[in-house]
Amino acid sequence: MCVCQTMEVGQYGKNASRAGDRGVLLEPFIHQVGGHSSMMRYDDHTVCKPLISREQRFYESLPPEMKEFTPEYKGVVSVCFEGDSDGYINLVAYPYVESETVEQDDTTEREQPRRKHSRRSLHRSGSGSDHKEEKASLSLETSESSQEAKSPKVELHSHSEVPFQMLDGNSGLSSEKISHNPWSLRCHKQQLSRMRSESKDRKLYKFLLLENVVHHFKYPCVLDLKMGTRQHGDDASAEKAARQMRKCEQSTSATLGVRVCGMQVYQLDTGHYLCRNKYYGRGLSIEGFRNALYQYLHNGLDLRRDLFEPILSKLRGLKAVLERQASYRFYSSSLLVIYDGKECRAESCLDRRSEMRLKHLDMVLPEVASSCGPSTSPSNTSPEAGPSSQPKVDVRMIDFAHSTFKGFRDDPTVHDGPDRGYVFGLENLISIMEQMRDENQ
């Protein structure tokens, strides 16, 4: 069974940033744009999420050629929580200890033996220098609904100095500017509420440790895409399957094999992140999806034309890999597309200046030079060394709680060929981006 070693949780109080020699105080992952489980920041290079056994086994069984397109799996931790006298909750991660008797529902599963993961040190691996925008200590109280009003207060130990603004349904900016992606905060509150409701029976929770795929980026622009024409797993109840099929039929999942599940994009003109959530994505038409993709690639001043080829190259590479994965199905899986919002190449700045001159807006040129100039210098967090290199982009598959393949966990349903629904979504995403590139050359 899982045990917490040494110290009690909560004894460090609401202002704790570390939880002793063994425990690590978890913080909400401020760049979560989609999903329903709360992602937590473990250290600069690692995030964690509530463990789902099927997803854990899937990460352990990944084909080698898929690993380029998925977060690195780093193991498991035990997570404890306890409210202090002021009503704040601390989530603390400890080494996961596996004994001979494991209190799990899946102990009888027959599959490939689990890899034995060394219990990694739970000290922070960095001081936060990779994310200079993160500051310490922000307190928020849950008060958005009667449900949340009863929840304990949430202590957020890190936040971004770059504000996040949610776009409402009419494409207007919300008035609220906060230091976390709104979806991240929502998921965190819901996760704490669920854990608190179960606390009478269970004090320990297993979390997966995964690579923080945005840690290379200073101002990560993230697009979360729900991929495929089908979202329900083979083991879904008839009710859930029907519900998921309706969502697909009423969205671009049916027509394109992909829909927007969330996004954040950094705006150079305002210095804010603009955010969209899954409800926005579900209501998009095909043209609306195109517009959302355009908005994701626009920094408030220009369309980032320099991103087309690097992203397309990644997407084509992923498509080629998945076409070789016979029997694999990635139901309800998402695809993250990531780039750095503060990166501005010299040629892009020159293009912008030329356009400005043609429009006789020479007075604006000093501002453009100012906004583009500083970011052409090497960044401590960006691997890009100069203006001649391609911008850093990344494409990663996430969320494998409903994935399957032949021989996996003795799943009774075995599928033939690759995941055609997922590949269909990639084909359409590639086609739309190619059209957008050609129209904006």
Curated annotation (Swiss-Prot):
Please list the residue ranges that the record marks as compositionally biased, kind Low complexity.
137-149
Mark out the compositionally biased spans (Basic and acidic residues): 150-160
Top-rank EC class of the record's enzyme: transferase
Which parts of the sequence are annotated with region: Disordered? 100-175, 370-392
Q: Does the keyword Transferase apply?
A: yes
Q: Name one GO molecular function term.
A: inositol 5-diphosphate pentakisphosphate 5-kinase activity
Show the catalytic activity: 1D-myo-inositol hexakisphosphate + ATP = 5-diphospho-1D-myo-inositol 1,2,3,4,6-pentakisphosphate + ADP; 1-diphospho-1D-myo-inositol 2,3,4,5,6-pentakisphosphate + ATP + H(+) = 1,5-bis(diphospho)-1D-myo-inositol 2,3,4,6-tetrakisphosphate + ADP
Location, primary (coarse class): cytoplasm
Q: What is its EC number?
A: 2.7.4.21
Q: Quick one: which residues bind substrate?
A: P220, C221, V222, L223, D224, L225, K226, M227, G228
Q: Where in the cell is it found?
A: Cytoplasm; Nucleus
- What are the protein's UniProt keywords? ATP-binding, Cytoplasm, Kinase, Nucleotide-binding, Nucleus, Phosphoprotein, Transferase
Q: One GO biological process from the UniProt record?
A: inositol phosphate metabolic process
Q: Which SUPFAM superfamilies match?
A: SAICAR synthase-like
Lineage, top-rank taxon, reads Eukaryota
Sites bearing Phosphoserine, chain numbering: S151
Start-end of Basic residues biased regions: 113-123
Q: A single Pfam family, by name?
A: IPK
Q: Composition bias, kind Polar residues: at what positions?
A: 372-391
Task: Identify the GO cellular component terms for this protein.
Answer: cytoplasm; cytosol; fibrillar center; nucleoplasm; nucleus
Would you identify the family this protein belongs to, as annotated? Belongs to the inositol phosphokinase (IPK) family.
User: What does the protein in this record do?
Assistant: Converts inositol hexakisphosphate (InsP6) to diphosphoinositol pentakisphosphate (InsP7/PP-InsP5). Converts 1,3,4,5,6-pentakisphosphate (InsP5) to PP-InsP4.
Which named protein is this? Inositol hexakisphosphate kinase 1
**What is the species listed in this Swiss-Prot or TrEMBL entry?**
Homo sapiens
| Gene behind the chain | IP6K1
